[in-house]
Amino acid sequence: MKYYNIDNYIRYKQDLEQAYKRLDKSLSYEEYTTDELVIIFMPLVENIARKFATSQQASGCMSILDLIQEGNFGLIAAINRIEWDTINSSDDQEKTLKSFLSKRIKGAIRRGVDMNRGNIRIPEHKLNKIRKGFDNNKDMVAMFFNSIFSSLD
């Protein structure tokens, strides 16, 4: 398993805390800038990254800081894709926004883990097929594993 530098993690937490203190808490989500939204939702990214780090999905191929970094890339991309009309029309804006962002963050972390796992790079569409239909499609799984083992011969 890859280890992370504790000093860097402590510095990251301190910087995040200082940036969070500087935010104006009286604004609605729509009134914040992109950078401010990133700062607000960085704890969500860290939460999701920690779940990946402790589960089998990351399986020791990336450190927690790498997972947080991939999650932040997904957070920035998700913030740029927010449709504020949909968020404003919902009953619970915070819940809607967090569920939208968490889906994008999880996808970015999953993609980062897939790219850094192992020596054989598998195309993303094949990984998605395997992930979705692992129980239902035995032929896909057999083809996937047979192609790996035949390439080792």
What function would you assign to each model-found segment?
Residues 1-122:
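Alpha-helical promoter-recognition and RNA polymerase-docking modules of transcription initiation factors
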Residues 114, 121-153:
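Charged, low-cysteine interdomain linkers and short loop/connector segments
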